[in-house]
Curated annotation (Swiss-Prot):
Main location: cytoplasm
Domain of life the protein comes from: Bacteria
Native organism taxonomy: Bacteria, Pseudomonadati, Pseudomonadota, Betaproteobacteria, Burkholderiales
Gene that specifies this protein: kdsB
Pathway: Nucleotide-sugar biosynthesis; CMP-3-deoxy-D-manno-octulosonate biosynthesis; CMP-3-deoxy-D-manno-octulosonate from 3-deoxy-D-manno-octulosonate and CTP: step 1/1; Bacterial outer membrane biogenesis; lipopolysaccharide biosynthesis
Any Gene Ontology biological process: lipopolysaccharide biosynthetic process
Biological role stated in the UniProt entry: Activates KDO (a required 8-carbon sugar) for incorporation into bacterial lipopolysaccharide in Gram-negative bacteria.
This protein's name: 3-deoxy-manno-octulosonate cytidylyltransferase
Catalysed reactions, semicolon-separated: 3-deoxy-alpha-D-manno-oct-2-ulosonate + CTP = CMP-3-deoxy-beta-D-manno-octulosonate + diphosphate
InterPro entries: Cytidylyl_trans (IPR003329), KdsB (IPR004528), Nucleotide-diphossugar_trans (IPR029044)
């Protein structure tokens, strides 16, 4: 795949996962997970693919497979902070588009990565672009692990929340608080996809921004940018992405998929 515009893909990878230790180095069909993610980023047409990690073992693994790697500090509170360090170290120009490809998503669609980068380029007033897809069932809308996003008329985010937004009052109120009895939403509801493209000038600013109260309450780092006045363009795609790897069960599922592909 050839991207219509240059962008840099950065894959943050940390070993200290509480639910799945050493996750970036987990074997998927003979290669570490982080390498599989980097391969997907390369397929997306990134001008440069970098893995950012505080672990030398991760850097060594990706370099063995021909990818560039950057050693970062171990105390970053988020992947965005890790990207900010990379942008500063490598001196990216203000307009460089940097895509954060999560290190635990080896099945991510390369076309989506490319499209989110292009979406940011098409929205010069926005510092960030991300993606979302429609959801239609009440159990999805009311699931706090599904982050919802409300958009304005131009497809720019108004708010992200774990709560059921927008709230279909006439549909939901008669059944409240019996979530199991809730009908389908009566207006479009979008689930956020955790893929981000940033302008490098914003990444340099991000570590200086104070944490926002809404960010702390929702535990959603993108709300810090919005709290401080930045705009986030949202690309709506019709299809849900492949799930990432958070637990041993997730890892076993994806390992089985890679084994089946090898047959």
């Amino acid at each position: 795949m050839t991207s219509p515009l240059p962008f840099v893909a950065v894959v943050p990878a940390r070993l200290a996962s509480t639910r799945l230790p050493n996750k970036p180095l987990a074997d998927l069909g003979g290669k570490p997970m982080v390498v599989r993610v980097a391969e997907r980023a390369r397929e997306a047409g990134a001008q440069q693919v970098l893995v950012a990690s505080d672990a030398q073992s991760v850097l060594d693994a990706v370099r063995e497979h021909g990818f560039d790697a950057v050693l970062t500090r171990a105390d970053h509170p988020s992947g965005t902070d890790r990207l900010a360090e990379v942008a500063a170290k490598l001196g990216f120009s203000d307009d460089t588009i940097v895509v954060n490809v999560q290190g635990d998503e080896p099945l991510i669609d390369p076309q989506l990565v490319c499209d989110v980068a292009s979406h940011l380029a098409a929205h010069p007033s926005c510092a960030i672009a991300t993606a979302a897809h429609p959801i239609h069932e009440a159990h999805e809308v009311f699931n706090p692990n599904y982050v919802k996003v409300v958009l304005d008329a131009n497809g720019v985010a108004l708010y992200f929340s774990r709560a059921p937004i927008p709230w279909s009052r006439d549909a939901y109120l008669p059944h409240w608080p019996n979530i199991a009895a809730m009908p389908a939403p009566t207006c479009p509801v979008y689930r956020h996809i955790g893929l981000y493209a940033y302008r490098a000038r914003f990444l340099r600013t991000y570590p200086t921004l104070a944490q926002a109260p809404i960010e702390a309450a929702e535990q959603l780092e993108q709300l810090r940018a919005m709290w401080h006045g930045e705009r986030i363009a949202v690309l709506v795609t019709e299809h849900a992405p492949e799930a990432g790897i958070d637990t041993p069960a997730d890892l076993e599922r994806v390992q089985a998929l890679f084994r089946s592909r090898a047959k």
